[in-house]
């Protein structure tokens, strides 16, 4: 069965998935708030961040959300974590949620500490859980656009919703694996961005592959410990939503979070680094939320804490590195 899909958010990530869904035979209407972007997509049939990609005819665009929702059998969002609440609030004003809503963004809301899925449930109410889905995993947008092989996970509370979303996204090169642990899938995608900043700092100081692999491994341990205390399944974090996404983000040349960390190591301030990158660096905001939650629940997360202190307490990076290296080496999995 082919879907009529409203895709909310036409940044590089949103466009890559909207393009994939259209190439998979679905009718897709992409929405964004920026009229200039929508006009360029509609008239030139090219995305400014990916001008080499031809847009299929069954992918159209609008900056009127109600037009995107007209006849939609599925809604997919691809906005930033900061944009999640206002976009879903606008969506709630236009429709009750009676079709699947697929979250594809990764992050934790500032101030509230809510996962993006929890924001959706707060806005639409607990009964909307039956329509909620979450897609995550190692999926660099530029590679998805090129049709490179990619494996992700999709999670949902309702088995029928899970099957519908799985069917819509699955292609010969975009491998979609079901996972029933929605919260674990969401947390893995959010927390890995903080570890990626630490890996970028390591890259900036040319500490080498041994140090970076150590950060990834110990970072995964932090993520798994955090998620388990939050009620998630540990094995979820050993899979695509945890280890897989963490590896891609920490080692990819296209990772904003890793580049951000590298720029910090080169002497830029956090604000200067964000300005130079010119796009949202989700790990900056997740570091604050994760630190607050970890502190409240007394979860020991030394790498995450160090990144937080560099970003929000002006901790000297060299001092932060020294503190990490001076920690006691306890039993590995304690």
Curated annotation (Swiss-Prot):
Enzyme active site: 192 (proton acceptor)
Main localization (coarse): cytoplasm
Keyword set, alphabetical order: Cytoplasm, Lipid biosynthesis, Lipid metabolism, NAD, NADP, Nucleotide-binding, Oxidoreductase, Phospholipid biosynthesis, Phospholipid metabolism
Domain of life: Bacteria
Pathway(s) this gene product operates in, as recorded in its UniProt entry: Membrane lipid metabolism; glycerophospholipid metabolism
GO biological process, one term: glycerophospholipid metabolic process
Gene Ontology MF term list: glycerol-3-phosphate dehydrogenase [NAD(P)+] activity; NAD binding
GO cellular component, one term: cytosol
The UniProt record lists the keyword Secreted: no
Record: residues binding sn-glycerol 3-phosphate: 106, 137, 139, 192, 245, 255-257
Reaction catalyzed: sn-glycerol 3-phosphate + NAD(+) = dihydroxyacetone phosphate + NADH + H(+); sn-glycerol 3-phosphate + NADP(+) = dihydroxyacetone phosphate + NADPH + H(+)
E.C. number: 1.1.1.94
Pfam (any one): NAD_Gly3P_dh_C
UniProt-annotated binding residues for NADPH: 13, 33, 106, 141, 256, 280, 282
Localization per record: Cytoplasm
Membership in a protein family: Belongs to the NAD-dependent glycerol-3-phosphate dehydrogenase family.
Functional description taken from the UniProt entry: Catalyzes the reduction of the glycolytic intermediate dihydroxyacetone phosphate (DHAP) to sn-glycerol 3-phosphate (G3P), the key precursor for phospholipid synthesis.
Name of the protein in question: Glycerol-3-phosphate dehydrogenase [NAD(P)+]
């Amino acid at each position: 069965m082919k879907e009529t899909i409203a895709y909310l958010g036409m940044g590089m990530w949103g466009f890559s998935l909207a393009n994939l869904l259209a190439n998979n035979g679905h009718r897709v209407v992409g929405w964004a708030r920026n009229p200039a972007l929508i006009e360029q997509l509609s008239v030139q049939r090219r995305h400014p961040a990916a001008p080499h990609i031809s847009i299929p005819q069954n992918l159209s665009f609008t900056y009127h959300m109600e037009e995107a929702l007209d006849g939609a059998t599925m809604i997919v969002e691809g906005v930033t974590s900061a944009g999640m609440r206002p976009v879903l609030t606008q969506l709630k004003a236009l429709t009750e949620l009676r079709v699947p809503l697929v979250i594809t963004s990764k992050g934790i809301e500032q101030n509230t500490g809510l996962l993006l899925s929890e924001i959706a449930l707060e806005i639409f109410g607990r009964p909307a859980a039956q329509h909620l889905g979450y897609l995550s995993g190692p999926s660099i947008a530029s590679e998805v656009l090129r049709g490179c092989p990619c494996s992700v996970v999709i999670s949902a509370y309702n088995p029928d919703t899970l099957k519908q979303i799985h069917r819509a996204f699955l292609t010969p090169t975009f491998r979609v694996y079901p996972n029933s642990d929605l919260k674990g899938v969401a947390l893995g995608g959010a927390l890995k961005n903080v570890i990626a900043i630490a890996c970028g700092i390591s890259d900036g100081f040319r500490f080498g592959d041994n140090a970076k692999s150590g950060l990834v491994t110990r970072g995964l341990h932090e993520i798994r410990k955090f998620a388990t205390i939050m009620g998630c399944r540990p094995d979820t974090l050993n899979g695509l939503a945890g280890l897989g996404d963490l590896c891609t983000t920490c080692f990819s040349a296209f990772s904003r979070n890793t580049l951000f960390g590298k720029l910090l190591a080169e002497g830029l301030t956090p604000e200067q680094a964000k300005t130079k990158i010119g796009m949202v660096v989700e790990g900056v905001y997740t570091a604050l939320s994760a630190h607050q939650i970890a502190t409240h629940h007394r979860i020991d997360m030394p790498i995450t804490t160090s990144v937080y202190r560099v970003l929000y307490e002006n901790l000297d990076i060299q001092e932060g590195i020294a503190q990490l290296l001076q920690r006691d080496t306890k039993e590995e999995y304690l």
